[in-house]
Amino acid sequence: CLSQASGKDVGALMNTWISQPGYPVVYASLDNGELALRQEQFFTGPHQPSDRLWPIPLDANDQRLPEILKEREQHLSPAPDGLLLLNHQNASHFITCYDDTLRARILQAIASGTLTPSQRAQYLNEQILLARGGLVASSTLVEALAAFQNESDHTVWEIISLAISDLKKFVDQDEAAEKLLRRLSG
């Protein structure tokens, strides 16, 4: 039995995931020296507000964070002062919306080659989904693409291609944005 082997109540963890539709977005933000984590159901179109909660295995690269986010919101102090990645091995079923400070740290790690190809692809894919859902501006996606200027991994380039395709829908009427997108896409 998985519960015996792992020492965790796998049945209770999985029940929520298989009994309710959708999946969550976790907002990660820094506030007065604390890390705030908040979960909501992720939507890409018109929707009614949802009060659904999931037990979310965070799989953070910072071991001080809890293994599972069970509440709607949780605050942790002190906040990590370096790179923070949630779901850093891409093993959980949620997306993360980082605040500007955390996002800037990730983009710096992408530009410097610190993240693995899988982590780079995951981050960019999440940004595409967040832009489609209206949770981040398409300009945030353009900013993210700039960090991939030296990208060499084929899989990551497939995700970059998806991002550029999505962005073309928004920049056709904006000459400055179109020029920037052309410069980024070569």
Residue ranges and their predicted role:
Residues 1-186:
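Non-catalytic accessory/interaction domains
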